[in-house]
Amino acid sequence: MVIATVAGFMLGGAAHAEEKLKVGFIYIGPPGDFGWTYQHDQARKELVEALGDKVETTFLENVAEGADAERSIKRIARAGNKLIFTTSFGYMDPTVKVAKKFPDVKFEHATGYKTADNMSAYNARFYEGRYVQGVIAAKMSKKGIAGYIGSVPVPEVVQGINSFMLGAQSVNPDFRVKVIWVNSWFDPGKEADAAKALIDQGVDIITQHTDSTAAIQVAHDRGIKAFGQASDMIKFAPDTQLTAVVDEWGPYYIDRAKAVLDGTWKSQNIWWGMKEGLVKMAPFTNMPDDVKKLAEETEARIKSGELNPFTGPIKKQDGSEWLKAGEKADDQTLLGMNFYVAGVDDKLPQ
């Protein structure tokens, strides 16, 4: 594959026969070898491996959300890509705008909720993995308090914090979670500073919804355990990582490209999780056998549908009742989640 630098971005792809389906990807960060963008790029490679000379792929990396995103999506559409994946929440409105201007192009937006005749939305139930992490954290923490590095206070991230909290409380009802927001999906410096600040505040477990390995490396340096994010980060902190929520986008990308090729593509809005294989857990490491066994059992129960992390009784942070015993949160509520559950030690930014 030819890689060329264009206007500060990396443009991957080689010119091949015109009849190939050209598939474009817009990335929030660099593909690198870890994290959110890495997993999307691995899925792109899986797409090429699965469909071979039927497809040609292109990507633009380090595309900022907002006006830059709209320009980049438009650029990649003008380049002849007929299927375009925009892989960050903040690309939603720019994707909607560009989709209107290119009705013959199919657009797929990750983690959002807006759709159009030629635009789908796809998301993963990351919160399912967060619940498993919470269970592990409560078993492994000696202090009963974990630190959580938040990226941007959108519902997806708030879901994860709350699910982590609920998983921990299923083991230790008095468990608490401290949160620091860095207001960025990828900023190694801020992520490292947040991890240090949380450890200084007394946490002995670190988890994150940010894209770099900075936090887990700080945890390693400070001698506490941590969780990876989006991909398996074990090689960066082999004695520190307990597990990671791993995003497996490959099967979805292959399915959608096949649909374009055979003419069956339709706009949809999907939210898949462990059951569908979009969310997986990295190997459970650096923990006693009994904790590993409980983690495996929890993962299996979520995957089978036996366990729904958002099942009452659950109280909000302010002490009010959210869900009665046995009551389950519906997807619409989760997709608009803008509050903490009880036990989270933070004021949610508005």
UniProtKB/Swiss-Prot annotation:
Residues 1-17 form the signal peptide. It holds the Pfam family Bmp. Adenine binds at residues 36, 185, 211. GO terms for cellular component: plasma membrane. Keywords: Signal. The keyword Glycosyltransferase does not apply. It comes from the Bacteria. Belongs to the BMP lipoprotein family. Binds adenine and probably also other purines, such as guanine. May play a role in adenine and guanine uptake. May be part of an ABC-type uptake system for adenine and similar ligands. This is Purine-binding protein BAB2_0673. It comes from Brucella abortus (strain 2308).
